[in-house]
């Protein structure tokens, strides 16, 4: 299962060199975790026995940028629907504005993208009784990864199991 951003530059099938039908892909701006998306992950993991969920974010994510813009200049979004995405991203990035990262926009965006990926992965791990049971009972793994638009490389950095000795 891949929960990814709706950005057209990050099609999971191409990123992971898979054919159509090989992946269960769920896409939404900023890979925000809302109830319908959790239900989709639960469906794939429970019904099809999928044992890996990848939360795939990417560099320069527009949803993260929109959230940072809103936090820096409140009142920018006139769309309640876009505001709902910003509101889901906000908790994972707003504390970064109180750090020295606020002085370096590129570093802030890089860390905010990763914080949002971590938050989405954590929400899946701990925000669903079904997924929690699958993690405990069946070895489901939820990992966070970032796709670099610049290099085409995916870096797995959150929730990656330690290699067996």
Predicted regions and their residues:
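Divalent-metal-activated hydrolytic enzyme cores
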Residues: 21, 30-50, 62-165
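Divalent metal-coordination and catalytic microenvironments
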Residues: 2, 26, 55, 144, ...
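Ordered, amphipathic secondary-structure segments that act as subunit-interaction surfaces
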Residues: 53-59
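Short, conserved "active-site rim" segments that organize catalytic pockets and cofactor/ligand binding
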Residues: 1-32
């Amino acid at each position: 299962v891949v929960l990814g951003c709706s950005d057209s530059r990050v099609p999971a099938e191409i990123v992971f060199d898979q054919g159509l039908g090989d992946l269960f892909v769920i896409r939404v701006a900023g890979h925000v975790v809302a109830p319908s998306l959790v239900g989709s992950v639960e469906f794939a993991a429970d019904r099809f026995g999928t044992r890996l969920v990848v939360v795939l974010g990417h560099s320069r994510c527009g949803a993260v940028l929109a959230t940072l813009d809103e936090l820096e200049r409140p009142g920018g979004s006139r769309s309640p629907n876009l505001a709902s995405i910003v509101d889901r991203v906000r908790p994972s990035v707003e504390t970064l504005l109180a750090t020295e990262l606020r002085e370096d926009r590129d570093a802030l965006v890089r860390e905010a993208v990763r914080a949002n990926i971590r938050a989405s992965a954590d929400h899946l791990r701990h925000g669903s009784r079904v997924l929690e049971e699958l993690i405990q009972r069946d070895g489901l793994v939820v990992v966070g990864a970032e796709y670099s638009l610049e290099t085409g490389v995916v870096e797995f950095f959150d929730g990656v199991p330690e290699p067996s000795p």
